[in-house]
Regions:
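Nucleotide/phosphate-binding sheet-loop regions of phosphoryl- and nucleotidyl-transfer enzymes
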Residues: 1-389, 422-425, 432-437, 443, ...
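Short beta->alpha connector loops at strand-helix junctions that form conserved
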Residues: 41, 448-450, 469-472, 560, ...
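Conserved alpha/beta-domain cores
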Residues: 93, 517, 527-876
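Structural motif
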Residues: 238, 408, 425-427, 446, ...
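Glycine-rich phosphate/ribose-binding loops and adjacent secondary-structure elements
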Residues: 330-332, 429-440, 444-446, 452-458, ...
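C-terminal domain-closing interface element
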Residues: 334-336, 491-539, 545
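Protease-associated
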Residues: 358-442, 504-510, 521, 525-529, ...
Length: 876
């Protein structure tokens, strides 16, 4: 049997979203439950997919079926396309299975031409309405289908109003609108080079193709990438007979929500316009009245609408967003969908629906978008002020929150200005580990280069700092401490505001409001913890971030990057001394200075964790990241070391690597300098012993992680150093404290030989940042240069550094997990890359049976919710 590409509203239901899209499925469902819906049909998402497979053409089979359904629609309505006695007019709307802003706008009044206008003008005894419909249709069709900009038509309307001495569109007469329709058609011909189509079926096919085309427009592609909507889904098209809200004062149109979408309050909220068509409310051409006032104008229709709202909310068991029209006092429902809402409203609605007995806890957990929680945890801009503030630039929303401060161009200045009590925004070409102190001191970070997983983005997310990255429009002049953006030069000390949730950049200081986490947040998180199987830890390397993560529900630390501790101002001289040492004795002398500092850090972390586990990753980055680059710092180091500047410069030059990502780093440092691993082991073990002595009830078991292992013999060599050092210390104090030694799986070879490595490891932690780099063979710092082209050409749909590539990298993770468990059934498995806070990646980790995910502190609630949703989905 051949595939069916069209469905009448009477043939579908709410469960057919994949085929009919959200709008089509809900129109069918409203029809099924007996609500007043203008009838029509839906062209399926499969027809859209076929359109692209056929080289952006609607094939003969689909065309014939559309025409067949036009005839069915004509029979149902008793009206015909182009008929001069009873003409059929329709709206054409897009409708993907997930709501997608940026898709094609609606086309209303399709089916009109000069002959039909004259007929409906006479039949309705309302020529003004008829010509208003026609000029709207010409304008919409030209804009939406043929991409002739709205502005050309708006200019003609303004000229007509000026000529007639009126200020509002509604004051134009039938003759004015008829003249305007003629001008619109002339404008169409001038821009397109052909006459405006008069055949309703030609108009319909043009509109359907435009809907399909809009699935692949730049706005839609960006939205899909940001919201995990696959390109392969396609969009449906809804062809619906018109209900007219613009036939007179006993007509109108409106949009309403069954609950307040901003607060979640259980109260009907919406707007209504008399004598208007749908897009007038949305476009803000006229100021609508609150929905409550509709009761005075149309008491019967309003009473019916209130009943419909209750029916729909009870039916869908969620807050509904509805569009409706009143034609001569009669109500017609044009659309319903689960309404978009603020994160705070989402939590309140979920809890209220549970309390009202409408849904259970699992449904409440499942209905909240995990990533939306991000905005609840960070300061936000005052929305009222934001409406009046122009956007001067837009880049990648790398770490959420809002920040405003005075511009500084270096980490040193950021620190110095903060110490003076100033709020600053750090603006850099790109950030490096040396900038961490400056990033901490800043309200937010703005970079010219780098993507969502650049150094700035990753570190900012870990700190809970706002970050906007990759603003290539900035012309940077670091030397003179200034940059140019949107035609204006900004100097050090000028005020700037950035929004890490949208990527928007604003001139001046936009006031912020603190995030507030209500009681509903705690309730929903409690439910999430009840149903999830996957543990959630955090990536943290200081007590402040640790305490923050514990507050957000982290069950321990999955990644403590020890190198971040070395960048503190009081430690960097000692690490540089170690790097520049000529002998083992000199190195050990420098390491002896670092050891008590590291031990102190670990003790503070263990105290903040209150007995929760912590995985400490030994030194990972290449040594060149620690050496000075500024002349003054080089001279200072030479003086401290008793060496000449030339000698220090030679040492620095010798550390240069052509590909440091794959160079002398990770366990390779511990193999060449085992004394580093020994020092770090002493610091971890002594810290744990001290804290255990003070808090015996915590039973701390240190977890030591060796990074960048690719060969089991590497792990064995470094592990021997760790075990020898740890056992000596533990036995010297007659303790029976246990500890674990594990490794990161971040090199493909480690994943492929996981069975061998598991014999020497107590745990695996998948470092998916490096595993992604090495599997794809590109550096995450450089990938931004070409990934945009890959998205445009549909080679990749997502940034593999933000969303785990389940086909390639995921296969390695799954293989390593399976082989590791077969070889060592007691092995503990986790993931600690940035992917640990991405909901789709969390679901993958649940499916492959990992024990925990670890992510930055502010992503912990997201991971907890995503883990619960994965478990709930698996049950159903």
């Amino acid at each position: 049997m051949s595939k069916k590409y069209c469905y009448l509203f009477t043939e579908g239901n709410a469960n057919m979203r994949e085929l009919l899209g959200g709008k089509g499925a809900n129109l069918a469902e409203m029809t099924n439950i007996g609500l007043p819906v203008p009838q029509g049909f839906t062209i399926t998402t499969e027809a859209c997919t076929q359109y692209y497979e056929d080289g952006r053409q609607i094939n003969d089979e689909i065309f014939a079926e559309i025409m067949e359904y036009v005839e069915k629609m004509e029979k149902i309505t008793g009206k015909k396309f182009g008929d001069l006695h009873n003409p059929l007019l329709v709206s054409v709307r897009s409708g993907a299975r997930a709501s997608m802003p940026g898709m094609m706008d609606t086309i209303l009044n399709l089916g009109l031409n000069e002959d039909v206008v004259n007929v409906i003008a006479e039949k309705s005894n309302n020529p003004r309405w008829a010509w208003d419909c026609y000029r709207r249709f010409i304008q919409m069709y030209s804009d939406v289908v043929m991409e002739v900009g709205k502005k050309y038509f708006e200019q003609l309307i303004d000229q007509m109003k000026e000529k007639k001495g009126v200020t509002l569109d509604v004051e134009l007469t039938a003759d004015d609108l008829k003249e305007l329709a003629g001008q619109f058609k002339a404008e169409y011909k001038a821009k397109i080079g052909e006459e405006f189509p008069t055949d309703p079926k030609e108009q319909l096919m043009g509109a359907i193709k435009a809907v399909f085309r809009s699935w692949d427009n730049p706005r839609a592609n960006v939205y899909r990438r940001d919201n995990d909507i696959p390109y392969s889904w396609g969009t449906a098209v809804n062809v619906q007979s018109m209900a007219f809200g613009n036939m007179g004062d006993d007509c109108g149109t409106g949009v309403a929500f069954t609950r307040n979408p901003a607060t979640g309050e259980k109260k009907l909220m919406g707007e209504f316009l008399t004598n208007a068509q749908g897009e007038d409310v949305v476009a803000g051409v006229r100021t609508p009245m609150p929905i409550a006032e509709m009761a005075e104008k149309f008491p019967e229709a309003f009473k019916q609408f209130e009943d419909v709202c209750k029916i729909l909310e009870d039916h869908y068991r969620d807050m509904q967003d509805m569009e409706f029209t009143v034609e001569h006092g009669k109500l017609y429902m044009l659309q319903t969908r689960n309404g978009k809402r603020t994160p705070a409203a989402a939590l309140k609605i979920a809890c209220d629906l549970v309390d009202e007995g409408m849904i259970d806890e699992k449904k409440a957990v499942a209905m909240i978008e995990p990533r939306s929680l991000d905005t609840l945890l960070h300061p936000q801009f005052d929305t009222e002020v934001l409406k009046k503030t122009p956007v001067i630039g837009k880049a990648l929303p790398a770490s959420p929150g809002a920040a405003c401060g005075k511009i500084v161009f270096s980490a040193e200045d950021a620190k110095a200005w903060k110490e003076r009590g100033e709020k600053v925004v750090l603006v850099r070409l790109e950030t490096s580990p040396e900038d961490i102190e400056g990033m901490k001191a800043s309200q937010g970070i703005l970079t010219v280069r780098g993507g969502m997983t650049s150094h700035a983005a990753v570190v900012a997310r870990g700190m809970g700092k706002c970050c906007v990255s990759g603003c290539g429009d900035i012309k940077m002049d670091e030397e003179n401490k200034q940059f140019e953006l949107a035609g204006k030069v900004y100097h050090e000390g000028d005020w700037l505001s950035i929004d890490g949730s949208t990527g928007n950049i604003y001139d001046g200081a936009v006031p912020t409001v603190d995030a507030s986490i209500g009681g509903e947040f705690g309730r929903v998180m409690g439910w999430a913890d009840k149903y999830r199987r996957l543990g959630v830890r955090t990536n943290a390397d200081n007590p402040h971030d640790t305490a923050q993560a514990v507050k957000f529900g982290a069950e321990g630390i999955g990644l403590c990057r020890t190198e971040h501790m070395f960048f503190e101002a009081d430690r960097i001289p000692a690490i540089r001394e170690m790097i520049c040492a000529d002998t083992l004795e000199q190195r050990e002398k420098a390491l002896a200075k670092l050891e008590p500092m590291q031990q102190g850090d670990f003790e503070a972390m263990y105290i903040a964790l209150e007995g929760r586990p912590m995985t400490v990753r030994f030194l990972d980055p290449p040594l060149h990241e620690f050496v000075p680059t500024e002349e003054a710092d080089i001279e200072l180091l030479a003086k401290d070391m008793g060496k000449s500047v030339a000698e220090i410069k030679n040492i620095i030059a010798s550390l240069h690597e052509f590909n440091p990502m794959m160079g002398h780093r990770g366990c390779r440092l511990a193999v060449t300098f085992p004394e580093i691993a020994a020092m770090q082991t002493r610091a971890v073990i002594k810290a744990a012993l001290n804290v255990n002595a003070a808090h015996p009830e915590w039973h701390i078991v240190p977890e030591i992680m060796i990074p960048l292992v690719g060969e089991v013999k590497e792990l064995k060599y470094v592990k021997d150093v760790v075990v020898k050092t740890a056992d000596e210390i533990i036995s010297s104090v007659k303790s029976d404290m246990k500890y674990k030694v594990g490794t990161m799986i971040e090199i493909p070879r480690a994943a492929l030989t996981a069975d061998e490595i598991a014999k020497e490891a107590d745990f695996f932690s998948f470092g998916t940042n490096d595993l992604t780099q090495m599997t794809f063979g590109f550096s995450r710092d450089d990938a931004g240069k070409f990934l945009g082209a890959y998205y445009d050409k549909k080679i990749y749909e997502n940034d593999p550094f933000a969303k785990l590539d389940q086909v390639g990298v995921g296969k390695l993770v799954k293989m390593a997990a399976t082989m590791g468990r077969e070889s060592n059934p007691d092995i503990h498995l986790g993931i600690c890359g940035e992917h640990g806070g991405d909901p789709a990646s969390v679901e993958f980790c649940h499916k492959v049976g990992l024990d925990y995910v670890s992510c930055s502190p502010f992503r912990v609630p997201i991971a907890r919710l995503a883990a619960a949703q994965a478990a709930i989905r698996e049950e159903t």
